[in-house]
């Protein structure tokens, strides 16, 4: 289109077209036509090319956006698979909000923003090259002047802005994550902040962060506008300078032709160079924005990324027979130290728990009980020694017999959903018969849920806001029993219960002992008085074991 416009201007400005213009007119077969016919044909060609370009651009843009969006989803899934394949300590090495950002907004910044801008850059570079070639055919001097002038301005603006753009992107990302963390904190600690009348402290802190984010966004917007206006000023000043020089050195008709060609070429070259410069700034900005994601990708690429096992649906409780699994647990000379700490949390620990035993593990805070639980669950691995369940390490057992080991934490996490969905955690609730859930609720003394208007489909509220602490823990126990485990680990799971409910749960555990191995971590000795064996830990070691009466004595 730029070439056709340039040829039209050359034809208007001179009775005798230049050699290159005339050659092209001959190629089109209109060299002998009058000027009006030539301009009409050239205009029709230009309009046709422009319409075709618009439809082609729309089609390619649609394909590109869908391609990048799908790549974004695939990258998020791959990174999430790798994240969930890590040890718990590495997963918790980042804040929840930082992880969420890295897997969502950060991935979009990498694909839709960085890769998308890169593809647009390539298209604009090809556009400039094609237009420059056609412009060289019409007027070499104008082509050189236009490319040199606008390229110099574009390079200069990029060199002055790109570092600041990346810093602003990093700052905005950091503040975005921090503000999300603060919002989560104020919601989680609402009662404590209310009684202190300090909710306004968080409101002010979050408000200041959002203000800084807004300022960073405004600065980036100003940089984009600045580039646009500088390029427009360059077009005007460049046109005036070239015009003045041409009127001094050339006849008026030639000067008008050169100015016209420059303005037409500027109308195509300047916006393309501006888009390239803006695209490069966008890339640098989003490199800052995507830093958490890029760090995650770099970290995982060093280790290799393996996909997780395919997801299987619910196949009925008979599927959870765990044939061949033995719940015999041993620990041989096990030691463990947390990263960046010198003192061992578990030190030369020896353990032997027979299949079907009900074992209580007690000890003061900091004795290593919860760390031992994490080692048994395979979410962390011993630094020295070995833990074996059914003759293999816990991670292998979980892969071979999923659900054979179950866990009830000290504080059960409740998802935003129904009672049934919480018990079916990790499975589609719609695939599980209601009778299975009703039986589990009766086992854990939660029959009151059955009388609710919605029954087991009643909502638990935001993070279990409609439940008491004891109800949450019993849902956690029902969740653990859902997969018919052969080894059940409870980490102070009854500490939030009242004495009556704790007694009922303890009685239930006593009634099922022998059918599975039960390991109960407790502070209160009363919780483990019916255990077959009680283990006393202190300083990461087993200092004694025996019956409840023996240890109490």
Residues of each region from the PLM?
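Transmembrane helix-loop-helix hairpins at lipid-water interfaces of multipass membrane proteins
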Residues: 1-52, 136-148, 252-256
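Hydrophobic alpha-helical segments in the permease module
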Residues: 46-53, 150-152, 228-235, 256-278
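Juxtamembrane loop-to-helix connectors within ABC transporter transmembrane domains
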Residues: 84-129, 188, 212, 216, ...
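Transmembrane helices of ABC transporter permease
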Residues: 120-171, 241-258
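Cytosolic ends of transmembrane helices, especially the final helix of ABC transmembrane type-1 domains
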Residues: 191-194, 198, 222, 268-301, ...
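Helix-to-loop junction immediately C-terminal to a conserved catalytic motif
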Residues: 377
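ABC ATPase nucleotide-binding domain helical subdomain, centered on the C-loop/LSGGQ "ABC signature"
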Residues: 386-391, 420-461, 506-507, 515
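ABC-family ATPase nucleotide-binding domain "signature/switch" substructure
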Residues: 406, 411, 422, 440, ...
């Amino acid at each position: 289109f730029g070439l056709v416009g340039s040829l039209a201007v050359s034809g208007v400005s001179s009775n005798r077209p230049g050699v290159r213009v005339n050659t092209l007119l001959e190629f089109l077969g209109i060299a002998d036509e009058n000027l009006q016919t030539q301009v009409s044909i050239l205009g029709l060609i230009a309009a046709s090319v422009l319409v075709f370009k618009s439809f082609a651009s729309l089609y390619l843009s649609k394909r590109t956006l869908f391609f990048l969006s799908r790549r974004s989803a695939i990258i998020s899934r791959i990174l999430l698979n790798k994240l969930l394949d890590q040890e718990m300590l590495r997963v918790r090495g980042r804040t929840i909000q930082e992880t969420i950002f890295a897997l969502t907004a950060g991935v979009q910044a990498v694909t839709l923003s960085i890769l998308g801008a890169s593809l647009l850059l390539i298209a604009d570079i090809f556009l400039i090259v094609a237009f420059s070639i056609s412009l060289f055919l019409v007027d070499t001097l104008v082509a050189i002047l236009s490319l040199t002038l606008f390229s110099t301005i574009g390079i200069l603006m990029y060199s002055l802005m790109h570092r600041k753009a990346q810093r602003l992107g990093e700052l905005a990302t950091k503040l975005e994550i921090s503000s999300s963390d603060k919002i989560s904190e104020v919601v989680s600690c609402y009662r404590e902040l209310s009684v202190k009348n300090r909710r306004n402290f968080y409101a002010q802190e979050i408000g200041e962060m959002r203000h800084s984010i807004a300022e960073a966004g405004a600065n980036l917007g100003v940089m984009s506008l600045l580039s646009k206006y500088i390029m427009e000023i360059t077009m005007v000043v460049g046109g005036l300078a070239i015009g003045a020089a041409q009127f001094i050195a050339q006849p008026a008709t030639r000067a008008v032709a050169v100015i016209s060609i420059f303005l037409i070429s500027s109308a195509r070259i300047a916006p393309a160079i501006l888009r390239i410069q803006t695209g490069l700034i966008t890339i640098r900005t989003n490199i800052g924005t995507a830093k958490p994601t890029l760090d995650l990708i770099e970290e995982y690429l060093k280790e290799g990324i393996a996909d997780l096992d395919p997801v299987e649906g619910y196949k009925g409780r008979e599927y959870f027979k765990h044939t061949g699994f033995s719940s015999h647990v041993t620990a041989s000379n096990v030691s463990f130290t947390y990263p960046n700490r010198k003192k061992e949390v578990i030190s030369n620990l020896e353990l032997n728990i027979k299949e079907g035993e009900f074992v209580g593990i007690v000890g003061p805070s900091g004795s290593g009980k919860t760390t031992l639980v994490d080692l048994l669950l395979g979410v962390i691995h011993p630094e020295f020694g070995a833990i074996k369940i059914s003759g293999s390490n816990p991670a292998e057992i979980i892969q071979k017999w999923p659900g054979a080991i179950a866990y009830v934490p000290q504080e059960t996490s409740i998802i935003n959903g129904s009672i049934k969905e919480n018990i079916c955690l990790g499975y589609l609730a719609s695939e599980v018969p209601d009778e299975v859930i009703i039986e589990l609720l009766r086992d854990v003394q939660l029959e009151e849920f059955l009388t609710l208007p919605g029954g087991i489909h009643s909502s638990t509220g935001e993070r279990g806001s409609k439940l008491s602490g004891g109800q949450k823990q019993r849902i956690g126990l029902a969740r653990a029993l859902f997969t018919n485990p052969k080894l059940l680990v409870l980490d102070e799971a009854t500490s939030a219960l009242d004495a009556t409910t704790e007694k009922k749960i303890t009685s239930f555990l006593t009634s099922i002992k022998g059918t599975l191995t039960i390991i109960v971590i407790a502070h209160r000795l009363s919780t483990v008085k019916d255990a077959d064996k009680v283990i006393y830990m202190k300083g990461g070691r087993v200092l004694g074991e025996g019956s409840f009466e023996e240890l109490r004595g």
